[in-house]
Amino acid sequence: GLVHDLSKYSWTEFSVGAKYYQGTRSPNDAERESKGYSSAWLHHKGRNKHHLEYWVDYSVDRNCVELVGMRMPEKYVVEMFCDRVAASKNYNGDKYTDSFPLEYYLRGRSRHHLHPESADLLEDMLTTLAEKGEDYTFDYIRREILHNK
């Protein structure tokens, strides 16, 4: 929506984007390589609910002291899906295919703290995109997930 990634216009994030921009990957990765962490990413993930890292917290199970993924509202999983597709198009340019976002997700899935239900929904959308294309997938999301909201 209109406020998607609005925090990127804050100085904390914008200055990193300007300094480390390469066009083929996130400037946050370059900052992380340079400084050992990404100040822009730490700022960004705490303000944008479509990032799975926003939903990481300590487990409600008192016997578990690990950080786990909390269940994300569906609208934010859909926004995360759209964000991943856009990033994949941006970083891959003319080489982009509708299978790229799923392939990227699957390569990094073991590192994610994503609630199982949120992961299932994201994987469903990414798989639908890879198998049936963008037009079908966005129609499917509107009809079946967002219920024409």
PLM segments and residue spans:
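Metal-dependent phosphohydrolase cores
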Residues: 1-149
